[in-house]
C-alpha cells in the first residue's frame, strides 16, 4: 500500500428512527408465528397479495364496461383481428366469473358457456323481441340438461318467432343441450328450410322438426313446443290407462290428447289425424310408446306444463310399481279436487290475487332464471318481477311538520351554499306534488256576474278530491312512476322519434289538433266533462257574442211585413211634407233686420244663410240628378250654418262674415230667397227619389259632406229675437 493512499475516516451512518425488528416484540405470538413460518408459505402469501389486486381490477364492472366499449369500437371499424377475439374472450370470462347477486349453488362448475352470447353487431339483424326469445329457448335447453331430462336425439324445443312469416327457432342437429347458446339457434320456416343460419356449422334435423311443423300448422295459437321422452314419460305413454289423476301434478297438467306416432309426419294423412286428435284447446300431446309434447302460448307456460308432466309421470310409475296395479290406486276426482288457479287463492267465497296479472308459470320460470344467473350462465332474461323490493317511505315529506333548529352541531360540515340550496329546494318542489298523500282537482267556480252579458264568469281553483262533488264516476290515481301510463313492450326508438317530431313541429310553429281517434271520430259530445275545457269554451263563447253585438247592428225592418213597410214609407213622406210646409212658413214670416241691429248678432244667429259649398241646384237639374241616382237621403233639415273660422274638408268657408254684413239688407234678403229656392229644390229631389229596400231613403252620391248643424237652443233664441223685433 503506498503512502499517498491514506484511508479516510468512515462517516457515521445516518440516524434512523426505528429499525424493522424493533417494531415487534419478541414475546408477541403473532411475530413468533410469522417467524416460524416456512419460506415457501411466505412466498405463496406474497404472490396471493399481488394477485389480489389483479383480481379486483378484473372483477370491477367499470373495467368490464370499458373493455366492452373498446370491443364495440373495433367492431364498428371492421377490424376482425385476433386481438379483438382475445378481448371478447376476456370479457366473456369476466362476466362468467363475476360475483352473483345471491349465493352460488353448491354445484361446482369450473367454466360454462354463457347463454347470451349475442353481441351488439349480431343483434342488429334480429327481429323485434327475437333476442329475448333466443335467450329463453337456450335457457330451457340448459334447464333440461340440469334436470337430466335431455336425450341425445329428438329432444327439441321450438319457438314461433312471427305469425306473419311463420319463422321458428330450433337448435341444430348434433349439438347437446349443454352447448346450445342464443347465437347457435337456427331460424327456419314452416317447411324446415333455413332462413337464418346460426353461429354453428351444423344442419337442421328436418325429420325431428316435421312433428313440430305439423303441430304449429294445426294450432296457430301455439307459440312454443317442448318434446320430451324421458323414461318416466315414455313409460306412461306406453300404458293403456294413460296418465292417471294420482297426484296433484296430474291435475295441473290439464287435458291430454293421445296419438299413435310412427316417427314421421311426411304424409298429409298423418297431419290430418294429428289435427283431429289435438283439438283446439289441448296443451299436452301423448305420443304412444314414444314420449310427450307440451304446448304453450309462451315459453314459461310450456315449461310449466313440462315440469308438472314429468313429476306426474314419475309419481305414477312409482305408484304402479309399488301398488301392483291400477285397481289398488286412489284416483282423484277432477270435480272435487280442483287445482288452484294461477295467482289466486279462493277462501270463504272471496278471491285474493296479485294486483299485477302474471302469465302461467312466469314466477316459477323467473326463479329458475335467477338460479342460472347465479351459476354464471348469463341468461339475458328480462325480469318483470324484481327479487328485492325497494323500500317505500312510510311518511311523505308533506305529512311531516316543518321544524326549525337555531343551533349547529360542531360535527356538522360546512353549510350548503345558497345557490345550491335553492336548486335542491326547486327539485324537491317538483316532486312534492307527485308524492303528496292528498289529491287535488282543478275546479271552475262561478265568481261574479258580468254587467253586460249577465252570465257567470268562471274562476279556477284547486280543491281536495274529497271536497269536490264528482260529476262522473272514477277515482283519482296517484302517480308513483313517471312511466306509469306508458304501454308495455313499446319501442323506445319510436318514442324518441315521436318526441323529435313534436320538437321539430314546435320549431317550425306548426300547430295542429293532434292525432284523431278512429273510435271517437263519429261521436259528437254534447258537453265536455273537463271543468277546464268548459271554462275555456264559456269564456270564448261570451267573447264571441260580445264581439258580434258590437260589430253587427240589428236591422229594424227585418221582422216587418210588406204592408207595414208601405205604411212606414207613407208616414215618412207625410212627415217630410209637413216639415217642408213649416219651413216655407218660417221663411215667409222672416223679416230682414236693420244692419245696426244685425251687427252685434253672431254669424250663426243672422237670418242670412251661409252659402253652401256646392252651387245652387235648379229644378231641372235636380230632377235629372234624381233620375240618375237610384236612392237619395231623406234629410229635410235646413243646411247648417257655419260659425266663423270653420274649416270644412281642409278649406276655409268662401263667404266671410264681414262680406255678408257689408252687402246690406236687400242683398241679404235676395240671398235668403235663392237659398230657400235651392233648399226647396233639394227637398223636392229628395222626396221624389226612390226608397231603399229597408224603407229608409238612401244617401245621394252627388251630395256633399254635411256641415255643422245649428243647435236647437240657438234656433229657439232666434225666433225669440224675431218676435221681440
UniProtKB/Swiss-Prot annotation:
Ranges of compositional bias, category Basic and acidic residues: 566-588, 622-631, 639-654
Interaction with calmodulin: annotated span: 425-444, 703-720
Bias (Basic residues) ranges: 701-725
Disulfide bonds: none
Biased composition (Low complexity): 687-700
Gene3D superfamilies: Class II aldolase/adducin N-terminal domain
Membrane topology according to the record: Peripheral membrane protein
Positions of post-translational Phosphothreonine modification: 55, 533, 612, 674
GO biological process, one term: hemopoiesis
Tissue specificity note: Found in liver, kidney, spleen, heart and brain.
Family membership noted in the UniProt record: Belongs to the aldolase class II family. Adducin subfamily.
Subunit structure: Heterodimer of an alpha and a beta subunit. Found in a complex with ADD2, DMTN and SLC2A1. Interacts with SLC2A1.
UniProt function note: Membrane-cytoskeleton-associated protein that promotes the assembly of the spectrin-actin network. Binds to the erythrocyte membrane receptor SLC2A1/GLUT1 and may therefore provide a link between the spectrin cytoskeleton to the plasma membrane. Binds to calmodulin. Calmodulin binds preferentially to the beta subunit.
Protein name listed in UniProt: Beta-adducin
Amino acid at each position: 500500500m503506498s503512502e499517498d493512499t491514506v484511508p479516510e475516516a468512515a462517516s457515521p451512518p445516518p440516524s434512523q428512527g426505528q429499525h424493522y425488528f424493533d417494531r415487534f416484540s419478541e414475546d408477541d405470538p403473532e411475530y413468533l408465528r410469522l417467524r416460524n413460518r416456512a419460506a415457501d408459505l411466505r412466498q405463496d402469501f406474497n404472490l396471493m397479495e399481488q394477485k389480489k389486486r389483479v383480481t379486483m381490477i378484473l372483477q370491477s364492472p367499470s373495467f368490464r364496461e370499458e373493455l366492452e366499449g373498446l370491443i364495440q369500437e373495433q367492431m364498428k371499424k371492421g377490424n376482425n383481428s385476433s386481438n379483438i377475439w382475445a378481448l371478447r374472450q376476456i370479457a366473456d370470462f369476466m362476466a362468467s366469473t363475476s360475483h352473483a347477486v345471491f349465493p352460488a349453488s353448491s354445484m361446482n362448475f369450473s367454466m360454462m358457456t354463457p347463454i347470451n352470447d349475442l353481441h351488439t353487431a349480431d343483434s342488429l339483424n334480429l327481429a323485434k323481441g327475437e333476442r329475448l326469445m333466443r335467450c329463453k329457448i337456450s335457457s330451457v335447453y340448459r334447464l333440461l340438461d340440469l334436470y337430466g331430462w335431455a336425450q341425445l336425439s329428438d329432444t327439441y324445443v321450438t319457438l314461433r318467432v312471427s305469425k306473419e312469416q311463420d319463422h321458428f327457432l330450433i337448435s341444430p342437429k348434433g349439438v347437446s343441450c349443454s352447448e346450445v347458446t342464443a347465437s347457435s339457434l337456427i331460424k327456419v320456416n314452416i317447411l324446415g328450410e333455413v332462413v337464418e343460419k346460426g353461429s354453428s356449422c351444423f344442419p337442421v334435423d328436418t325429420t325431428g322438426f316435421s312433428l313440430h311443423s305439423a303441430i304449429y300448422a294445426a294450432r296457430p295459437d301455439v307459440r312454443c313446443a317442448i318434446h320430451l321422452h324421458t323414461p318416466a314419460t315414455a313409460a306412461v305413454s306406453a300404458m293403456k290407462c294413460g296418465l292417471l289423476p294420482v297426484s296433484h301434478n296430474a291435475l295441473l297438467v290439464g287435458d291430454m290428447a293421445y296419438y299413435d306416432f310412427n316417427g314421421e309426419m311426411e304424409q298429409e294423412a298423418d297431419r290430418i289425424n294429428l289435427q283431429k286428435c289435438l283439438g283446439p284447446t289441448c296443451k299436452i300431446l301423448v305420443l304412444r310408446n314414444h314420449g310427450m309434447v307440451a304446448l304453450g302460448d309462451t315459453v314459461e307456460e310450456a315449461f310449466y306444463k313440462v315440469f308438472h308432466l314429468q313429476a306426474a309421470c314419475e309419481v305414477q310409475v312409482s305408484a304402479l310399481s309399488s301398488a301392483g296395479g291400477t285397481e289398488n290406486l286412489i284416483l282423484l276426482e277432477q270435480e272435487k279436487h280442483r287445482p288452484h288457479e294461477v295467482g289466486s287463492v279462493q277462501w270463504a267465497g272471496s278471491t285474493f290475487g296479485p294486483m299485477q296479472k302474471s302469465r302461467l308459470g312466469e314466477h316459477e320460470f323467473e326463479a329458475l332464471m335467477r338460479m342460472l344467473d347465479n351459476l354464471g350462465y348469463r341468461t339475458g332474461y328480462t325480469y318483470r318481477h324484481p327479487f328485492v323490493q325497494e323500500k317505500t317511505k312510510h311518511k311523505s315529506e308533506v305529512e311531516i311538520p316543518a321544524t326549525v333548529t337555531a343551533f349547529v352541531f360542531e360535527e356538522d360540515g360546512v353549510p350548503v351554499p345558497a345557490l345550491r340550496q335553492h336548486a335542491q329546494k326547486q327539485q324537491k318542489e317538483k316532486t312534492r306534488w307527485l308524492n303528496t298523500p292528498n289529491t287535488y282537482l282543478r275546479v271552475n267556480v262561478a265568481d261574479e256576474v258580468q254587467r253586460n252579458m249577465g252570465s257567470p264568469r268562471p274562476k279556477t281553483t284547486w280543491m281536495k278530491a274529497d271536497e269536490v262533488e264528482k260529476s262522473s264516476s272514477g277515482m283519482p290515481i296517484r302517480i308513483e312512476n313517471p312511466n306509469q301510463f306508458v304501454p308495455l313492450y313499446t319501442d323506445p326508438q319510436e318514442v324518441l322519434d315521436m318526441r323529435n317530431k313534436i320538437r321539430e313541429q314546435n320549431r317550425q310553429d306548426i300547430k295542429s289538433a293532434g292525432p284523431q281517434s278512429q273510435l271517437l271520430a263519429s261521436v259528437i259530445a254534447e258537453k265536455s266533462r273537463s271543468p277546464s275545457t268548459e271554462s275555456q269554451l264559456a269564456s270564448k263563447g261570451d267573447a264571441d257574442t260580445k264581439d258580434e253585438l258590437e260589430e253587427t247592428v240589428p236591422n229594424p225592418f227585418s221582422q216587418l211585413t210588406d204592408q207595414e213597410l208601405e205604411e212606414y214609407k207613407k208616414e215618412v213622406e207625410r212627415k217630410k211634407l209637413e216639415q217642408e210646409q213649416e219651413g216655407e212658413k218660417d221663411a215667409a214670416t222672416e223679416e230682414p233686420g236693420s244692419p245696426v241691429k244685425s251687427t252685434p248678432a253672431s254669424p250663426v244667429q243672422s237670418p242670412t244663410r251661409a252659402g253652401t259649398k256646392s252651387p245652387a241646384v235648379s229644378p231641372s237639374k235636380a230632377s235629372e240628378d234624381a233620375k240618375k241616382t237610384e236612392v237619395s237621403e231623406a234629410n229635410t233639415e235646413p243646411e247648417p250654418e257655419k260659425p266663423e273660422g270653420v274649416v270644412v274638408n281642409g278649406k276655409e268657408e268662401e263667404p266671410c262674415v264681414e262680406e255678408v254684413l257689408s252687402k246690406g239688407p236687400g242683398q241679404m234678403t235676395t240671398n235668403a230667397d235663392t237659398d230657400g229656392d235651392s233648399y226647396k229644390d233639394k227637398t223636392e229631389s229628395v222626396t221624389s227619389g226612390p226608397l231603399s229596400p229597408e224603407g229608409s231613403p238612401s244617401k245621394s252620391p252627388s251630395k256633399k259632406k254635411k256641415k255643422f248643424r245649428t243647435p236647437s237652443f240657438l234656433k229657439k233664441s232666434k225666433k225669440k229675437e224675431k218676435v221681440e223685433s
